[in-house]
Amino acid sequence: MKLTKLFGLATLVSAVALAGCKDDKPAAAAAPQEPAARKLTVGVMTGAEAQVTEVAAKIAKEKYNIDVKLVEFTEYTQPNDALTKGDLDANAFQHKPYMDKEVEQRGYKLAIVGNTFVFPIAAYSKKIKNVSELQDGATVAVPNNPSNLGRALLLLEKQGLIKLKDPSNLFSTSIDVIENPKNLQIKEVEGSLLPRMLDDVDFAIINNNYAVQQGLTAEKDGIFVEDKDSPYVNLVVSREDNKDNEAIKDFVKAFQTEEVYQEALKHFQGGVVKGW
């Protein structure tokens, strides 16, 4: 009987001792989960511009936790159509004169979110090295879309090769040429085809993205080049209905960085100017 009592007492003491040793610290809280990455689909022109934008996409992921999917296009008419249809959240390929014309002609509801670069257009030739070598009746190929056509004509006027009815009109066409002292034959051609025309014309005015694809750079190969005061700064554009999307604004911040600028210099070899 005594042994039973002693055993019971020992058990009670052990239980109390164990209770005293119990860790009263609260359980560690679970580590907070990383917020889900935001997602953006951005349209760009294929080639060097796409490669530069890939760096912006990398920075957007690292700094702002945005997964950026780039969709590449080969024709200027495609990215705004895809944006309007909702296939893209934004695009980065056009300047304001081009966007304004698209809005006017196609009724797109677009908004500017930020600037990227000025990619100066330039005149290239396999037949002459200086504009002074141009013969009477020389043939020049220019882009055929409205804004880049006007841009090319303004560049020709700045060189004294033609005179336009209204130089302030960014959408001048061939019928607005009121003086043409060298009787230039102006051929309007789809932009992506212009580099291939160099064997058939005296010179061509080519956008930088198409020129670079053929190993041409404005700084090294251009007969004459658009300067930094051009109004044709490229843009990041959204639809009106998503222009306040914070992810798009953060993507612009990622684009407007020194790392992206240095990548652009590498691909365009001096043929690029910061737009911010």
Curated annotation (Swiss-Prot):
PROSITE patterns: PROKAR_LIPOPROTEIN (PS51257). GO terms for biological process: amino acid transport. It is a lipid-anchor. It comes from Pasteurella multocida (strain Pm70). Keywords: Amino-acid transport, Cell outer membrane, Lipoprotein, Membrane, Palmitate, Signal, Transport. It holds the Pfam family Lipoprotein_9. It comes from the Bacteria. Residues 1-20 form the signal peptide. One of its GO terms (cellular component) is cell outer membrane. Belongs to the NlpA lipoprotein family. The gene is metQ. A lipid is attached at C21 (N-palmitoyl cysteine). SUPFAM superfamilies: Periplasmic binding protein-like II. InterPro entries: Lipoprotein_NlpA. This protein is a component of a D-methionine permease, a binding protein-dependent, ATP-driven transport system. It is found in: Cell outer membrane. Its main location: membrane. This is Probable D-methionine-binding lipoprotein MetQ. A lipid is attached at C21 (S-diacylglycerol cysteine).
